[in-house]
């Protein structure tokens, strides 16, 4: 068998979405279970809690119609709804779809010593490696609700937020893809250990 020549045609560039879906283990580590996706989203909620924003984080894992739906909600400060960046994406959309987008890079010390997870990567990882993901955030009397399919932005809704009992917060839910994980469910032993460390 002749050796295959390596030339300029062998070099190609992938988008962050394409690369992450081709090599999920680079960011997710062990891809036996989808545990890391939950860890990343929970870590974001914990970062808010540690800064004094909110006092409740809820995790719900549901198995229905042979599909897993994982949900994390908090009553932290939430994202600023409908705040549009120079690239035309809202802050919320970019935070879940544009790699290396984060509010934890500045040197103002706000998150110093508190930030968990893969800053600027974790929420995108969850989006990229799920069949679908949706996130709703609310604050200042407004909300923004966005949907992704296979890591690609699908649609957005926004409007007034009238629930005075929940003035601010964020809810993220997703369906991890079996294409990238041997088992799309989470390893509950790992999650229980993580939560025990956090609450202690």
Map each language-model feature to its residues.
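Glycine/threonine-rich ATP-lid/beta-loop region of ATP-binding domains
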Residues: 173-200
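GHKL (Bergerat-fold) ATPase N-terminal catalytic module, capturing the glycine-rich phosphate-binding loop
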Residues: 1-176, 181-182
